[in-house]
Amino acid sequence: IRSYLWVQDLWPESVSAAGKMNSGLVYRMLTKMVQSIYQKVDGICIQSEAFSQSILQKGDYKHKISYIPNWAEDLFTDDSLINKEHFKSLIPDGFVVMFACNIGVAQDFDSILKAAIRTKEYKDIKWVIVGDGRKKEFVEQQVKELNLCDTVFLLGRYPLEDMPDLFIHADVMLVSLKDQNIFSLTI
């Protein structure tokens, strides 16, 4: 049976960039584990062509690498499927900046919160955060401590099928990652 690995994140680089470790025994062990996986699989599929360099630094895997980009499901391309009324009551009135993703370390919520603070006096600018993750409680706490409750709204997690119904209410969609070279390879 042939086996293929579809690489969505580069390890251990992504773990390091998220602030979990930069070197040491665990980092070296992760590197060896990743090298072992790359050696054992028949093919390595990458979602970003920029991933090749990192993978090739771990060994001679050029013959195994294939580029297979991420795609969007049809529900994101068929406007007739959108129900504008579905989430209307949850979305505040105003200019909506929407973030819909993992609420984690790599997403750089410190910068998002700084931006929300800078726009706090503009009451018509609303920051809507859709998702869940390790930093959700931190973000909720910061929204309260920084007195951002009138402009920052955390809606929680929703299934993929609901995303177009949420996105239709956004004036701007926000994509945020820490300023680390490894993360620039995925966008």
Residue ranges and their predicted role:
Residues 50, 68-71, 157:
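Carbohydrate-associated surface elements
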Residues 128-131, 137-164:
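Nucleotide-activated donor-binding/catalytic signature segment of Leloir-type glycosyltransferases, i.e.
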